[in-house]
Amino acid sequence: MKKRLLMGLLVLLSSVTNVANAALELIITDGIDSARPIAIVPFKWQGTKALPVDISSVVASDLQRSGKFSPVPTSKMPQTPYNESEINFDAWTNLGVDTLLTGSVTQNEKGEYVINYQLVDVVRGQLTSGQSRALEDGQLVLSKDHVLFNKVATITAPRMREYAHRISDLIYEQLTGERGAFLTRIAYVVVNDKDKFPYQLRVADYDGFNERLVLRSKQPLMSPAWSPDGRRLAYVSFQNGQAEIFVLNIYTGEHEKLTSFPRHNGAPRFSPDGKKLAIVLSKTGSLQIYTLDLQTRQLTQITRDRSNNTEPFWHPDGKSLIFTSDRGGKPQIYRVNLSDGSTSRLTWQGSQNLGGQITPDGRFLIMVNRSDSGFNLAKQDLETGAVQVLTKTLLDESPSIAPNGGMVIYSSIYDKKNVLSMVSIDGRFKARLPATNGRVRAPAWSPFL
């Protein structure tokens, strides 16, 4: 079945194309008053022209979106130190800040940008007046142990925003012990009825910047899903008059059709090791879940009842799948063990639960929960069963979890059209990424890149 295709009506952009002007704009809709205060001081820059990217602004925005940090507004900063030696520790601790990022940017003779930056423990710096001592070779010497890290990087202008996300990742990991997910991407489908090719598959940085068009079609595109290496996207296309599953290499443009069984082919999802796809087929009647070995093309049926079973998602250990089924009358989320086929129901609160995903640590189930207030994202503790509704947006669907489990992106309705929205895993931070030129659906968060 491995067959190279000319897409016909589906136009593949063999070299990834930048979309003119940012098509997604992140708008904060709910704050994080209880998050940890942190100071991201504007970096010093003495060049004749403006920096290509405001590094400190990108870092502050990243940390705020995580829901764990509350960056101090620049207007409320008591000073703007450009290195550790200039910090007035008392002034910052009086503001309630315990950690501060400071830095500077210069330009070398090659036109590259040299970034020096430090993350400082303000409380420890205050206690030691920035002059603590430590034993070294049996002698007390001055120590800078209040400096959590001190780094230098040389980058080009096109990489500056990317490197700002890298700084955010370093801070996040230093302060939380968890890996940051700011150097990741999202894939999504944009629908614009006025365009010659109204269905477009796009990829952007997680915050909506650097959007690129990778595929466009006159027929619907659905259900993009990333491979674990972040190089391929599985998706559903109706280019031949029915739903079929394809895989696209977003770097080379190479793609192939994987399934074209009678009736429905949908909901592809890569296994954690990237060797299989979980898919949904209706070739025997109702919707059933299968796994497809990508090397041998062996198809294995997982569910076998008369109900409709769909939206498979792999447990992080790769040994089971969760899925949505109407076997109880209305959609609820179940789990099936791939070794013996045993199945158990996971959701009990709410008249419907669907679109389930499990966080990378295996602790929580993120899902669309229907209650009297409508369809909203909810989080269920898989050990205790406790459910927390995370959103108050309208007609939520298609949740996708960041690879570190810290945030969720999803589709909702705003101003009568589909937009992407974002919520931190604890529900404290919320934002919208509305498109300026169409309806946006089916987001998929990439793995770590």
From Swiss-Prot:
InterPro entries: 6-blade_b-propeller_TolB-like, PD40, Tol-Pal_TolB, TolB_N. The keyword Cell division applies. It comes from Vibrio vulnificus (strain CMCP6). Part of the Tol-Pal system, which plays a role in outer membrane invagination during cell division and is important for maintaining outer membrane integrity. One of its GO terms (cellular component) is periplasmic space. Belongs to the TolB family. This is Tol-Pal system protein TolB. PANTHER family: PROTEIN TOLB, PROTEIN TOLB HOMOLOG.
